[in-house]
């Protein structure tokens, strides 16, 4: 699971996530960003010990489909939650890898699905990747 440790809201709309809430790795942007940094055998172990369930009609419940998405996450550098955890919400997330390349933390930017167009997702992803570079530099990891 992931645990939300900080959250900032903007505007009157509220997402269901809140500080302290636990959510599954397999259907959240930050979860998928973290999973993409793990070796395949660890991913399989996590999957096997997870209570995988369909939270929305878009939730991934097939390990091979998740593996396929994680290949994209590694290639792009960011993960997308496309209404998999909460209907009407899309999320862009990037992991913060440690010195060994494995991530134990990540951050995300979420918005209402109609406003999170492919173009906006690309712009947000670019900003998030730039922020990750700055964070890693501040931590002395890059």
Report each predicted region and the residues it spans.
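Short acidic, gly/pro-rich beta-turn/loop elements at beta-sheet edges
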Residues: 4, 15, 117-119
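Extended hydrophobic
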Residues: 61-131
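Intrinsically disordered, low-complexity terminal regulatory regions
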Residues: 1-10, 123-142
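Short linear Ser/Thr-Pro motifs
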Residues: 17, 108-110, 136
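Aromatic side chains
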Residues: 4-6, 26, 78, 91
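Generic beta-structure capping elements
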Residues: 5-10, 37, 49, 109-112
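Short, solvent-exposed recognition segments
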Residues: 12-85
């Amino acid at each position: 699971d992931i645990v939300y440790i900080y959250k900032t809201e903007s505007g009157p709309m509220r997402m269901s996530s809140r500080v302290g809430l636990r959510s599954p790795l397999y259907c959240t942007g930050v979860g998928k960003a973290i999973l993409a940094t793990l070796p395949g055998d660890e991913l399989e172990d996590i999957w096997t010990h997870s209570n995988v369930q369909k939270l929305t009609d878009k939730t991934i419940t097939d390990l091979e489909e998740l593996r396929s998405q994680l290949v994209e996450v590694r290639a792009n550098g960011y993960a997308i939650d496309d209404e998999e955890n909460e209907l009407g919400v899309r999320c862009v997330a990037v992991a913060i890898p440690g010195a060994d390349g494995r991530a134990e933390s990540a951050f995300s930017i979420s918005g209402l699905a109609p406003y999170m167009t492919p173009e906006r997702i690309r712009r947000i992803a670019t900003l998030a990747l730039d922020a990750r570079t700055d964070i890693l530099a501040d931590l002395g990891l890059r």
